[in-house]
Amino acid sequence: MIHSLFLMNGGGAVFLEKHWRSVVSRSVCAYLLEAQLKAGQPENVAPVLATPHHYLVSTHRHGISFVAVIQAEVPPLFVIEFLHRVAETLQDYFGECSEASIKDNVVIVYELLEEMLDNGFPLATESNILKELIKPPTILRSVVNSITGSSNVGDQLPTGQLSNIPWRRVGVKYTNNEAYFDVTEEIDAIIDKSGSTVFAEIQGVIDACIKLTGMPDLTLSFLNPRLLDDVSFHPCVRFKRWESERVLSFIPPVGNFRLMSYHVNSQNLVAIPVYVKHNINFRDDGSTGWFDITIGPKQTMGKVVENILVIIHMPKVVLNMTLTAAQGNFTFDPVTKVLIWDIGKIILPKLPTLKGLINLQSGEAKPEENPTLNIQFRIQQLAVSGLKVNRLDMYGERYKPFKGVKYVTKAGKFQVRT
């Protein structure tokens, strides 16, 4: 299965390595580094690379490349899923998954990797079990361990390992019983010059924070579950109930976890929450051009569009730009030719506008194509797909928990062609 694991930072340097079967030289990561340089961005590299003697399976999370080295063919998705589990476990343990946090807790990281893989095969990947095996770091525990010479390794067998519900331990108790759900939707879209939608889809996730005493059995229902495509669930979800009734029935893990992810690819179900009016043109003699952009809300159900950022890669012949912003701040880098307009939030009735002159390099031909607008935004308390949580029912326990749902819509790869 997995022979070695390497963690690389943004500069391509290996700052952590772990070997299970045989020691593989870190020089094997040079193949991945070369592929990253060719691709421009680490996210654009193919997840599986073949080298003369190994296969490299990698994923990029939190600015870190997680690289698994294997020698025989195995299902790539199996390895990729394990790498994501490693990243999520480090995030859960240390609050962030960064080079600094990993180096500060390097002993715990090695203890976790030792438990998560047994001779290269996944063994314990559930956060609930790992936290019983390896105690999460705290300031007090670190001080006690340094004085007594003890470690974070637990001295008892995890209770969840022996049950048919490995993601939840027995005897869980909370003073305040609460269940919160975050519905986050990311919209990817391409809008053409006329404002028509060329492509649009939604990637959504439902993250849960469950702190309930005992062994509760939860049922989460939706008002319109039929709009969801390509769903994937946490192992706790009873898939047959979803297939027959379109409800989520599950005994939850303790704490934070991703309950499900889903996809909406029907364009008539994807409401575009912003519109853009644009007028970008260049004179035929190639001396100057005119730039005029206005952004406004559309189909936002009265919610405020926040954190709006417009990024435009201008043509190479652009020398500088003389612009005026009715709202927000803008910067133009004459070296990279990147214009960034930070709008913030749209405060009606006035719409944010950016307009002015474009100065081109003398003697150069008129640009053949207009630039594309890359737009980022965020809308609180709105699921752009129309997904709504109906109710949450609890069985098996007698107390009444606090319940809450939060919705967020944000832009993914949102482009407007001019």
From Swiss-Prot:
Regulated by phosphorylation. Residues 176-417 form the MHD domain. One of its GO terms (biological process) is intracellular protein transport. It comes from the Eukaryota. It is a peripheral membrane protein. Keywords: Cytoplasmic vesicle, Golgi apparatus, Membrane, Phosphoprotein, Protein transport, Transport. SUPFAM superfamilies: Second domain of Mu2 adaptin subunit (ap50) of ap2 adaptor (SSF49447), SNARE-like (SSF64356). InterPro entries: Adaptor_comp_med_subunit, AP2_Mu_C_sf, AP_mu_sigma_su, Clathrin_mu, Clathrin_mu_CS, Longin-like_dom_sf, MHD. It holds the Pfam family Adap_comp_sub. It is found in: Golgi apparatus; Cytoplasmic vesicle, Clathrin-coated vesicle membrane. GO terms for cellular component: clathrin adaptor complex; clathrin-coated vesicle membrane; Golgi apparatus. Belongs to the adaptor complexes medium subunit family. Adaptor protein complex 1 (AP-1) is a heterotetramer composed of two large adaptins (gamma- and beta'-type subunits), a medium adaptin (mu-type subunit AP47) and a small adaptin (sigma-type subunit AP19). Component of the adapter complexes which link clathrin to receptors in coated vesicles. Clathrin-associated protein complexes are believed to interact with the cytoplasmic tails of membrane proteins, leading to their selection and concentration. AP47 is a subunit of the plasma membrane adapter. This is AP-1 complex subunit mu. It comes from Diplobatis ommata (Ocellated electric ray).
